[in-house]
Amino acid sequence: MRPRALYTGPVEEQRSIRHRMQFILTFSCPDQPGIVAAVTSVLAERGADITETHQFSNRESGTLFMRLAFHAPAPGNLAEINAILAPVAKRFGMQMRLHDAAVLPRIIIMVSRFDHALLNLLYQVRVGWLKADIVAIVSNHTDSAATAEQAGIPYYCWPVNKQNKTEQEDKLRALIKERKADLVVLARYMQVLSDSLSAELSGRVINIHHSFLPSFKGAKPYHQAYARGVKLIGATAHYVTADLDEGPIIEQETARVTHNLSVEDYIATGRGVESQVLARAVKMHVEHRVMINGHRTVVFA
């Protein structure tokens, strides 16, 4: 018996769907009437089919944030569509970005000894939930070398100390350029990036902190939480800035704990939360659902 097609409509329509390219448009600008109509009208005139829209108007700053996903007739390309949208962007003073949804974002993952968040990211990529290309794994330890080898991903072990930190960060800069990485993910990488590197990679580095920020910043947050007798522990995925654990928050989650649990129980519970929160944050970033709004983020989940 022949398998049934997922779509049973007219053959011509199926051909049309196959020959359309998907793009994602994100922009922010001073809010005023007519912006959405202007953008969607230009896309409609080009024959685009808008499949998803999200928008948020920040009343405090008077800024509009918007994300649109759309199909455009082939052979469409970024340069052509950017040129079509340029007059609208200029008219409304937009900060605009257009992305080809077929191009997988390239990610470098950095990890120290605890590999639970790394393993979950690799799994989510393998099963197709996280659509990205992991182009390298960097660590200051050798612990995850076998994991990288099994996954067929280049592994770089660069131990870090006060004397060689600048040299090792220069290696990272070179690797990002060589591998054409779009994003760096700190999956429990226990080294603090320098202020200069944090600024250079602004909006391109996501960290998972093992506490529900802004509570318990810095080292050993589970021990801090245990000492305070909290009833909830959590994890926070945020963009990295020069201020430690102060970057714009992308995603958070909590888990309930009780008085009869040990610090080790807190840590074990937290590992699952960290892995889930980081994976969700990375997914939202690579799908261009996160827009930085000062010290905050707009997340079109």
Describe the residue ranges of each PLM region.
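N-terminal amphipathic/basic-hydrophobic helices that include classical n-h-c signal peptides
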Residues: 1-20
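A conserved regulatory-domain signal marking ACT and ACT-like small-molecule sensing domains
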Residues: 19-105
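Short hydrophobic segments within beta-strands
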Residues: 28, 108-110, 138
